[in-house]
């Protein structure tokens, strides 16, 4: 419930394959029946007037892979992470690839990821998500040259095979980035269009070509082809073209079939037509049904989450609400809960538990910088992330306090050191708290404390065995909390005698159900 809406939800197990239903509204003084097109005070006999669910097709059921809701993701920007064990060179590099130059900026490699799997797993991650790793021109690897090989600045195909195998041996999953909305300037098909103009057999692979197609050196010159945003070096692909669809669907199959990856994160997914995504889903799921598909969608994403396109999306709304409440402290607990409730109620339950909940990524400012380097605010946000419904995603280095408001800063090289900083120890405790308590992954969510003009927020996560209660005191004043019949799992600033929380304190309780 919030200022504007009451929210209701029911899980119905029906023995009937056809269901007709209506809503009964009762405020204690008046009862109305709602049939969609009209209200009435009496029951309607004509079932054609009812809401109807004529048949539940398996293909229409949103069913993300079962492993997803238990996952804790560690998101790695490969160029920035590691060259070796607890080390990154910070040095730029250039490599030749089929006559083209690929570039690295900070020296990160796949070998560096392999040699730091102990660190990632000990932190509490059960899955790694790698930003683009295929051969591409620039350090970020979003300007693709070759979709079938690892960028030489990052290593070899065999390095990647070893990474996947090593992760699987540890019980960890691997998700990679799929960039199909656009390619690089020197991608073979676009290069053919530039060289052969209207005679190119790939001219229909791209949008809005004006011949002759040229690569403008001046960044202020608008190109004679459609591109990603205003990035002239990233021509936009025509994913409505069956040839383009089949090419990229085979890419999707290839990395699952040959390297056994566990998922695709799909770049700028909302800019690509649904027909392509449905074909891509079918291609990938035929190879490995448990391969997760996560779309990059910045807005509300119900459209893509009905079981026929994606299993999950990057939940930037989660970040936005956490920013307002924890980092900026610009909204109170009641408003935060209203926004979180609205976000939760948009999605079907299986999808809600598979949403990728991030505080930051390679595209946005570091959350620690939004907290103005205040570890207390950061810690409360992280604890909420690890105890909320959905898959928590940690961007590399967040646990080490990497700071950055601009792109050059928030893709900063990993700050390796021998000792874990205090923030990293907090991350480790919070991530392990989640993985050790199934109620935090699969349990129901219920708000128990969220008042106006107050920063105290409380909620419960409950499964068939355990109830976990969390209180976050996101304010500069101490706060009393309701008595809880349970034992403390973790606390900071909790005074049991007075049942109160210190400013910016928290308490996590557990009790058997």
Give the role of each language-model region.
Residues 1-72, 77, 83, 89-91, ...:
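Carbohydrate-interacting/catalytic domains
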Residues 12-16, 77-80, 134, 151, ...:
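Short, flexible loop/turn elements at secondary-structure junctions
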Residues 71, 77-126, 133-258, 280-286, ...:
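Substrate-binding/active-site clefts of carbohydrate-active enzymes
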Residues 72-74, 128-130, 174-176, 264, ...:
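Hydrophobic faces of well-ordered beta-strands that scaffold small-molecule active sites
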Residues 76, 120, 130, 147, ...:
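Conserved, mostly hydrophobic/aromatic
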Residues 79, 306-308, 312, 353-360, ...:
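Aromatic/acidic polysaccharide-binding cleft in carbohydrate-active enzymes
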Residues 141-150, 230-232, 316-321, 407-415, ...:
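Short glycine/proline- and charge-enriched loop/turn segments
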Residues 164-172, 182, 187, 191-198, ...:
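Active-site-proximal helices and loops of the catalytic beta/alpha 8
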